[in-house]
């Protein structure tokens, strides 16, 4: 068992942080639009994969594979990232702030399923309530079983 702070831990953490840069780069081009669409209560453009990522193995397109989260450890690192973590929380809260609409009005199929998968993943990566609140509100408090199986 490796101890905290060993050189191999440091390399792993650094490699994961560098790999997360793919999300930062993708979001940089669209984050203002993402916020506007979520505030309006309807996703209109293509950004789901890198704003609300899912666990590896759920998506089969090249884009889905590129932005898949490989493990619970990577999900935890995503949440701890100084840009990605706050953005994910903010975007999730914007979805939660939408009132009077079912999730299928906010995210058309299959993005409604991707959102559920993402919320399930991050609810397992942290005790923060915001992610669980999302699937409680929109999915009757039922997690995405495909995500849970892969964790």
List where the protein language model places each region:
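Residue-identity detector for glycine
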Residues: 3-5
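Charged phosphate-binding loop/patch that engages nucleotide di/tri-phosphates or the phosphate backbone
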Residues: 125-151
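Short, conserved active-site entrance elements at the starts or edges of catalytic domains
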Residues: 17-34
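Hydrophobic/aromatic-rich, well-ordered segments within soluble, folded domains that form packed cores
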Residues: 37-72
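Mid-chain, well-packed structural core segment of small domains
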Residues: 77-122
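Residue-level detector of well-ordered alpha-helical segments, enriched
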Residues: 43-50, 87, 111-118, 130-134
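C-terminal end-helix/capping segment
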Residues: 68-87, 142-146, 150
């Amino acid at each position: 068992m490796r101890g905290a702070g060993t050189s191999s831990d440091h390399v792993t953490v650094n490699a994961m942080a560098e790999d997360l840069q793919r999300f930062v780069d993708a979001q940089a081009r669209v984050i203002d639009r993402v916020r506007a669409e979520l505030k309006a209560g309807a996703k209109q453009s293509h950004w789901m994969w890198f704003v609300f990522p899912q666990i590896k193995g759920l998506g089969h397109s090249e884009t889905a594979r590129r932005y898949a989260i490989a493990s619970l450890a990577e999900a935890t690192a995503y949440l701890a990232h100084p840009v990605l973590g706050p953005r994910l929380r903010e975007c999730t809260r914007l979805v939660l702030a939408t009132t009077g609409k079912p999730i299928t009005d906010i995210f058309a199929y299959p993005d409604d399923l991707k959102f559920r998968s993402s919320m399930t993943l991050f609810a397992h990566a942290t005790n923060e309530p915001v992610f669980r609140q999302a699937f409680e509100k929109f999915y009757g408090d039922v997690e995405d079983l495909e995500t849970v199986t892969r964790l």
